[in-house]
Amino acid sequence: MTVGIVEEKSITFQTDLRLESGRILGPITIAYETYGILNADRSNAIMVTHAWTGSAHLAGRYCESEQKPGWWNEIVGPGKLLDTNRYFVICSNVIGSCFGSTGPASINPKTGKKYALTFPVITVRDMVRAQALLIDHLGIERLHAVMGGSMGGMQALEWATQFPDRIASAVILATTPRPSAQAISLNAVARWAIFNDPTWKKGEYRKNPRDGLALARGIGHITFLSDESMTAKFGRRFSAKDGQFDFFGQFEVERYLNYNGYNFVDRFDTNAFLYLAKALDLYDVAWGYESLEEAFAQVKAPMQFFAFSSDWLYPPPQTEEMVRMLKKLGKPVEYHLINSAYGHDAFLLEHETFTPMVRDFLKKAGA
């Protein structure tokens, strides 16, 4: 069963949020969706946190004709992993994004114009502090769980370290305590693609720049896949529409990247892409602490980690570093290494590989 037709909601907070940079952002609008019913003692809420280019549209459809359901539709609904007969599931769009929450494409109330590059640099920690405002608004004192993959996993880490008394458990998939130099360098090249697109106009564009963002998305998309998955899907096949010795002829993998890159341009704001890339690069769960050990000393909730064998963006050793530290500190932690050919995106594509473990973990968290 599915959650059916859903509605996006939003709330605007007139209070200012002091950011990690020291700058002030306000008012703040947060777009969110909820699924299921909050129980009488408000103890069954699960916050699902999205990745880089995700949104609050976690599951269901806005109308019958909507082509695709929410981005993790397979795990949310009656009888599914996040059973809406049991849990009240929340997903909000992070600040800095472009799907309803305040970001660089939003109107600055002080100027009446889009923020563009006057928008302050935000961090993952800032995103989570904004989410805490939403949870307060919903009247929830303590979340049953926070669950997310990739940048969503970073948000779950921040909930565990910054709001340790407000979560009962955390499920973290395909993430890292801090992006590596390689991960940062790939985002840097993606930024160059945008900066060198003349239609970007230093962020003051009227129409979303196409070529720079499409190329940047193509670079990012490669990091989400793996050699195994790309070989299986495309191999070295040449596009049937092109002659092999046509200078501009494309391999199937080229055509795929081209299609997905330009399709992305139609749904995502370029400046938001840049701001969230910066937030990813800046991320360090130990920011503000002397060490990872000191950061994880704050953790109180049981934590469950998943890494995927072919993920080369945030490879398993990065997850294992966190697990070792939590074990050293005597914190309750589970770790599962999933054998997968789908690379970083495995957490989105192979939910059946982790569903049984997460279901049991969530039940224990509520025991």
UniProtKB/Swiss-Prot annotation:
Binding site for substrate: R217, D345
Domain AB hydrolase-1: 44-350
GO biological process, one term: homoserine metabolic process
GO molecular function: homoserine O-acetyltransferase activity
Enzyme class: transferase
Keywords in alphabetical order: Acyltransferase, Amino-acid biosynthesis, Cytoplasm, Methionine biosynthesis, Transferase
GO cellular component: cytoplasm
EC number: 2.3.1.31
Superkingdom assignment: Bacteria
UniProt pathway: Amino-acid biosynthesis; L-methionine biosynthesis via de novo pathway; O-acetyl-L-homoserine from L-homoserine: step 1/1
Primary location group: cytoplasm
Active site: S150 (nucleophile), D311, H344
Annotated catalysed reactions: L-homoserine + acetyl-CoA = O-acetyl-L-homoserine + CoA
Subcellular localization, as worded in the UniProt entry: Cytoplasm
Transmembrane segments: none
Family: Belongs to the AB hydrolase superfamily. MetX family.
NCBIfam families per the UniProt record, alphabetical: homoserO_Ac_trn (TIGR01392), PRK00175.1 (NF001209)
Function of the protein: Transfers an acetyl group from acetyl-CoA to L-homoserine, forming acetyl-L-homoserine.
Subunit structure as annotated in this protein's UniProt entry: Homodimer.
Record protein name field: Homoserine O-acetyltransferase
